[in-house]
Amino acid sequence: MRAEGDGGLERFCSPGKGRGLRALQPFQVGDLLFSCPAYAYVLTVNERGNHCEFCFARKEGLSKCGRCKQAFYCNVECQKEDWPMHKLECSPMVVFGENWNPSETVRLTARILAKQKIHPERTPSEKLLAVKEFESHLDKLDNEKRDLIQSDIAALHHFYSKHLEFPDSDSLVVLFAQVNCNGFTIEDEELSHLGSXIFPDVALMNHSCCPNVIVTYKGTLAEVRAVQEIHPGEEVFTSYIDLLYPTEDRNDRLRDSYFFTCECQECTTKDKDKAKVEIRKLNDPPKAEAIRDMVRYARNVIEEFRRAKHYKSPSELLEICELSQEKMSCVFEDSNVYMLHMMYQAMGVCLYMQDWEGALRYGQKIIQPYSKHYPLYSLNVASMWLKLGRLYMGLENKAAGERALRKAIAIMEVAHGKDHPYISEIKQEIESH
């Protein structure tokens, strides 16, 4: 495993957790523990033209594939390197036209199958954990999850049968189940979705809600850096989920996606839960039952909004955000994470509608509580400072813009490393204003 020492890490059996990763040497905050090239990856459809399909570089003036006119590259080298994967989709996209719509999971799984055929031996991404060793949790899948896998398998056959040989159906069920609980989403500095990938050695790490490392991306390379001091013999933990929410919500999410309940210090003590579900200070305080009902309402509206994003207009979405905040504010403080969730969604809609002032107003309300609820070095907090900084700059408030961007840089220097291209880009934004 590549590291800035001599390995300094080992795979071990973690009590009650199965396999895990353990430090053999000390790591300071900001140290790179290791990096892992993607075993297989795919750029999300919405980012085509903004990023190179092969190296994920973000730049103007990418060249498009002459055959399908859908894939974009830095140059001929990137295009040539990407061909073994792009050929799975190039002519099918032309043939199917508008009807070409495999999910990102299906696209990624097709690439894993192609990779296994091209490179059957162990790859540099699998120094400590091989793809074939991935946990699938097959025995824990309910009928709904099994049905989703079956429809993915059908889509795989439908869109990829011309260029791929498939294993038997049982093996495909296992592979999709493995991808579902070991896949990663690659995000940019504002946490916008760029694509999906498999990083086997990164998948070896177990989860904690107080993680001691953070995973970031440099193109299609995953990098793992310490966000707490790590001593020799200590297990290395990342977080699989968004840490904003209270313990019960986090564990519902972990059970649903990864089939375990977390027993980290945060989940055992529930130290942050009271502040996360902050109740409005009223002369006549809300009763326990009213609080319970409002939490239930909040969870439902979060789910309703998630579904509504796929078919409702921006103004309808904004209305859901505003009405739900109004209703919740009878019981919840503005710093309550359920309020923050809807503010964050509203900010996203404002950004989409290019209502910069509206987005800024929401961002200003979100940033302080975010800094309190999230761990010290958090990509969620960094990306919020970054969005705020860019909004201020765009609205000609240079002083506030620079302050916010520097806050983002301070977190990113630890999480992404001081030499990350994102940091040079942000410094450039400060200089050029």
UniProtKB/Swiss-Prot annotation:
Its EC number is 2.1.1.-, 2.1.1.354. This is N-lysine methyltransferase SMYD2. Zn(2+) 1 binds at C52, C55, C74, C78. Zn(2+) 2 binds at C65, C68, H86, C90. It is an enzyme of class 2 (transferase). One of its GO terms (cellular component) is cytoplasm. Residues 7-241 form the SET domain. The keyword Acetylation does not apply. It comes from Sus scrofa (Pig). Signal peptide: none annotated. It catalyses: L-lysyl(4)-[histone H3] + 3 S-adenosyl-L-methionine = N(6),N(6),N(6)-trimethyl-L-lysyl(4)-[histone H3] + 3 S-adenosyl-L-homocysteine + 3 H(+); L-lysyl-[protein] + S-adenosyl-L-methionine = N(6)-methyl-L-lysyl-[protein] + S-adenosyl-L-homocysteine + H(+). Interacts with RNA polymerase II and HELZ. Interacts with SIN3A and HDAC1. Interacts (via MYND-type zinc finger) with EPB41L3. Interacts (via SET domain) with p53/TP53. Interacts with RB1 and HSP90AA1. GO terms for biological process: negative regulation of cell population proliferation; negative regulation of transcription by RNA polymerase II; peptidyl-lysine dimethylation; peptidyl-lysine monomethylation; regulation of DNA damage response, signal transduction by p53 class mediator.
